[in-house]
């Protein structure tokens, strides 16, 4: 049986990536310095982060401790990534600069591409790759 999903102004259909971070992580200051706002944070008994919801200019995402029981590990343990977080922003250069100042590692500087995008890429302190982008043509 197929069911149609109708979004209202109150409940829009959107993606909210869940980024896995190492177990026993206590500090996510990078994301706050990068411009994220914390909505909520659930901590384990030892104070480490279980899950936190963050938002950057309306784009919601979650950080969650590693859950190896179903194969979810963070990029550092995996020695690589299987996806890239694409974030569309009004000013690619400003966001790239802010990320680098907050502690990210630049993978590729912001530049214009023939396919009509301005893009730059960085790796955050937990190993996640972010593609910062804007349509330009």
Predicted regions and their residues:
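Vicinal oxygen chelate
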Residues: 1-18, 29, 34-88, 96-123, ...
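C-terminal catalytic core of tyrosine-transesterase DNA break-rejoin enzymes
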Residues: 126
């Amino acid at each position: 049986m197929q069911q149609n999903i109708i979004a209202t102004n109150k409940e829009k259909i959107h993606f909210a990536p869940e980024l896995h971070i190492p177990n026993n992580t206590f500090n996510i200051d990078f994301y706050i310095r990068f411009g994220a706002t914390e909505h909520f944070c659930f901590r384990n008994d030892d104070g480490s982060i279980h899950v936190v919801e963050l938002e950057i200019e309306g784009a919601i995402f979650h950080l969650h401790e590693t859950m190896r029981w179903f194969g979810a590990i963070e990029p550092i343990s995996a020695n690589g990534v299987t996806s890239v977080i694409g974030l569309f922003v009004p000013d690619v250069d400003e966001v790239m600069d802010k990320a680098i100042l907050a502690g990210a590692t630049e993978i590729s500087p912001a530049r214009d591409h023939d396919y009509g995008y301005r893009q730059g890429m960085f790796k955050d302190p937990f190993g996640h790759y972010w593609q910062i982008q804007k349509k330009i043509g």
